[in-house]
UniProtKB/Swiss-Prot annotation:
It comes from the Bacteria. Essential cell division protein that forms a contractile ring structure (Z ring) at the future cell division site. The regulation of the ring assembly controls the timing and the location of cell division. One of the functions of the FtsZ ring is to recruit other cell division proteins to the septum to produce a new cell wall between the dividing cells. Binds GTP and shows GTPase activity. It comes from Rickettsia conorii (strain ATCC VR-613 / Malish 7). This is Cell division protein FtsZ. Keywords: Cell cycle, Cell division, Cytoplasm, GTP-binding, Nucleotide-binding, Septation. It is found in: Cytoplasm. GTP binds at residues 24-28, 111-113, 142, 146, 190. One of its GO terms (molecular function) is GTPase activity.
Length: 452
């Protein structure tokens, strides 16, 4: 007997983090992260503009909507951007399916980023991937139309992502000066994404005293709502406190306050000279900013030899305004002329009434009395129009007109429904014996037959 002994393959079990850049702004953000040599994440870029895609530093590229846009861009139309992403859905799904966490970065207000980012986020949600959106909003000088387009895109995106981080470009003026170049200003905005991704990856790949696993990170990042993300570095005296205060006061974010946060992720990184008291001071300074006593605060600390003499504090506060997040509801086929359920149930509860057609030949020519039927009470309001006022048949011949022909027929119908016929002084039609000599043609045909 031959035994085949084979050494087990080395299986690496670690979470896969993907940074997905969408449109021109998203592609530029990915380029800056690749240039900064960020470790621990995979990069993918997707664009409708073939020329912009060609100049990307990323090797994983998706040409969105080849048939829809033919590589010419979305023309600032979110609808075209969405159609392009839907056309390339299978390719997007292939790049996402092995990821545990994805950062989707885009610029809101244009066509590709505004329209495609929600589609990509929806695919990630369907795959069960922890999804974080990091997007920018237009400058004020770009006009109200572009800002409204961005706001609509944010509403659409927010229902698919677990956490949303918004960076208004207008906030760049808070940190820029007259010498700041346009490219440097946008790089500052991209650094927010860079710091956030690095803060997550460092917790999982860097050695440290307090390491966090992916389940810890997912518990915080899946709180829904908007998020605040910041990083601060400091050296010298009180470096831990200074780094923490810098992290929690990011001037670029739409929500720079941690008030109302449901989850907080703290990462404190330093060199071998970082002390226990410094870690405690930094963590407590951040905790003071959280007003929610039930907030889920997860803390980690790692070592980085390159940070000797410095301390870096990264914080992510999630679940801000979580109660205002729109709920994603899968689309259903539209139908028309549907009766509301309440109305339908009431109709079913009512008994069906079938009225028989009366036999006009069976009516007697003698005097009859017509009594009201409960079934016909709802028609009383229309009796005046038909010459059937309630007092018409009770008045004497001297003070009231004779019932009209229509009144006679209507009264006969009411009598048939109630099946109650009583004698009274209402004359339908009689032939007086004294008028036998009247012209025979003055008598209705059906009465002539009865007479004969």
């Amino acid at each position: 007997m031959v035994l085949n002994i084979k050494a087990p393959e080395n299986i690496v079990l670690k979470p896969t983090i993907t940074v997905f850049g969408v449109g021109g702004a998203g592609s530029n953000a990915v380029n800056n992260m690749i240039s900064a040599n960020l470790q621990g994440a995979n990069f993918v870029v997707a664009n409708t503009d073939a020329q912009s895609l060609e100049h990307s530093l990323c090797t994983n590229k998706i040409q969105l909507g080849v048939s829809t846009t033919r590589g010419l861009g979305a023309g600032a139309s979110p609808e075209v951007g969405a159609l392009a992403a839907q056309e390339s859905e299978s390719e997007i799904r292939n790049y996402l399916e092995n990821s545990n966490m994805v950062f989707i970065t885009a610029g809101m207000g244009g066509g590709t980023g505004t329209g495609s980012a929600p589609v990509i986020a929806r695919i990630a949600k369907e795959l069960g991937i922890l999804t974080v959106g990091v997007v920018t909003k237009p400058f004020h000088f770009e006009g109200g139309h572009r800002m409204k387009t961005a706001d609509k895109g944010l509403i659409e995106l927010q229902q698919f992502v677990d956490t949303l981080i918004v960076i208004p470009n207008q906030n760049l003026f808070r940190i820029a000066n007259e010498q700041t170049t346009f490219a440097d200003a946008f790089k500052m905005a991209d650094d927010v994404l860079h710091a956030g991704v690095r803060g997550v990856t460092d917790l999982m790949i860097m050695p440290g005293l307090i390491n966090l696993d992916f389940a810890d990170i997912k518990a915080v990042m899946s709180e829904m709502g908007k998020a605040m993300m910041g990083t601060g570095e400091a050296s010298g005296e009180d470096r831990a406190i200074k780094a923490a205060e810098s992290a929690i006061s990011n001037p670029l974010l739409d929500h720079s306050s941690m008030c109302g946060a449901r989850g907080v992720l703290i990462n404190i990184t330093g060199g071998s000279d970082m002390t226990l008291f410094e870690v405690d001071n930094a963590a407590n300074r951040i905790r003071e900013e959280v007003d929610n006593l039930d907030a889920n605060i997860i803390f980690g600390s790692t070592f980085n030899p390159e940070l000797k003499g410095m301390i870096r504090v990264s914080v992510v506060a999630t679940g801000i305004d979580a109660d205002k997040v729109p709920t994603y509801k899968p689309a259903i086929a539209e139908t028309t002329n549907i009766v509301p359920e309440e109305t339908y149930n009431k109709a079913i509860a009512q008994p069906t009434q079938i009225e028989e057609m009366p036999d006009f030949n069976s009516y007697s020519t003698e005097n009859i009395e017509i009594t009201d039927s409960p079934i016909n009470q709802n028609f009383i309001g229309n009796e005046k129009e038909l010459g059937l006022h309630a007092n018409t048949f009770n008045k004497s011949e001297d003070d009231s007109p004779k019932p009209s022909f229509l009144g006679k027929i209507w009264g006969s119908l009411r009598a048939s429904n109630n099946q109650t016929l009583e004698r009274k002084n209402v004359v339908v039609s009689t032939l007086d014996q004294d008028n036998k000599e009247s012209d025979i043609h003055d008598i209705p045909a059906f009465l002539r037959k009865k007479r004969d």
